[in-house]
Amino acid sequence: SRTAKQKEEREAQLSGVAEFLGGRIAEIGVPVVIMGMDSFDRRIIHQNLGDQGGMQTESEGFGTFRRLKVRSLK
């Protein structure tokens, strides 16, 4: 289990990843599937890409095989 400080650090790191991903996905216009993230990580990416606008995120699959699909709406 993560401490509060670890969660804050991870959230900041994932916010940067989401910003980068949003830019790249908008640039290339191809949906991207991200695997290997726990529910906390997926939620942070969902929230950050939603805040950027112009992106659609969707979790697919079940359990340890759950993945995040991201596509540009532009």
Task: Name each region found by the language model.
Residues S1-K74:
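RNA-contacting regions in translation and RNA-metabolism proteins
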